[in-house]
Amino acid sequence: MIDYEKIKKAVIMIIEAIGEDPNREGLKETPDRIARMYEEIFSGIRETPEKHLSKVFKVNNDDVVVEKDIQFYSMCEHHFLPFFGKVHIAYIPNGKVVGLSKLARTTEVFSKRPQLQERLTSQIADSLMEYLKCKGAMVIIEAEHLCMSMRGVKKWGSKTTTIVTRGEFQKDNSLKQDVLNILRL
């Protein structure tokens, strides 16, 4: 559970620090709105992927499973500005698969917290290896970072791509290339 009062006090201090009046009509309810928003967008802090990856289904083959274009958003831990984009997940089952929605939910567990894209990519892949005991995992994230668009270098529309491979995807370049071809990356 988050500390609403502490967040509200901090937001009031920020409003005052930038030279605004926290009692101005448009800002009166802002501290409460931000506290409620933070509970939602940082809900992954209180979750683990285990609850999403523990329900599995037996399969008789170990063909690659690819779930692409999972939309996500997260908050850059350096500037507390959003980054957002698409996650593509591939894994090689080891006799069991997980429901496809569980891959999106696992993405949310890790994206709904202050985050780095590089860490997010690794956490998703590592959780698949740990909980599914799959033969290999590959996660690709393409994201736009508002800390690159709104401030500093101000390069709107630039995207960052991170790729993490585990297991068989690290050992067999043709498997990795097959997934990239499916995704057309």
From Swiss-Prot:
EC number of the protein: 3.5.4.16
The reaction(s) this protein catalyses:
GTP + H2O = 7,8-dihydroneopterin 3'-triphosphate + formate + H(+)
Residues reported to bind Zn(2+):
C76, H79, C147
Task: Cite a single GO MF annotation.
Answer: GTP cyclohydrolase I activity
Sorted alphabetically, which keywords does the UniProt record give? GTP-binding, Hydrolase, Metal-binding, Nucleotide-binding, One-carbon metabolism, Zinc
Protein origin, superkingdom: Bacteria
Q: Which stretch is the leader sequence?
A: none
Q: In which pathway does it act?
A: Cofactor biosynthesis; 7,8-dihydroneopterin triphosphate biosynthesis; 7,8-dihydroneopterin triphosphate from GTP: step 1/1
Please give the PROSITE patterns that the UniProt record associates with this protein.
Answer: GTP_CYCLOHYDROL_1_1, GTP_CYCLOHYDROL_1_2
Q: Output the Gene Ontology cellular-component terms.
A: cytoplasm
Give the matching InterPro entries: GTP-CH-I_C/QueF (IPR043133), GTP-CH-I_N (IPR043134), GTP_CycHdrlase_I (IPR001474), GTP_CycHdrlase_I_CS (IPR018234), GTP_CycHdrlase_I_dom (IPR020602)
Q: Name one GO biological process term.
A: tetrahydrobiopterin biosynthetic process
* Summary of subunit composition and partner proteins: Toroid-shaped homodecamer, composed of two pentamers of five dimers.
Query: Which NCBIfam families does the protein's record reference?
Result: folE, PRK09347.1-2, PRK09347.1-3
PANTHER family in the cross-refs: GTP CYCLOHYDROLASE 1, GTP CYCLOHYDROLASE I
Its family remark reads: Belongs to the GTP cyclohydrolase I family.
Q: What is this protein called?
A: GTP cyclohydrolase 1
Could you tell me which species this protein originates from?
Clostridium novyi (strain NT)
Query: What gene is behind this protein?
Result: folE
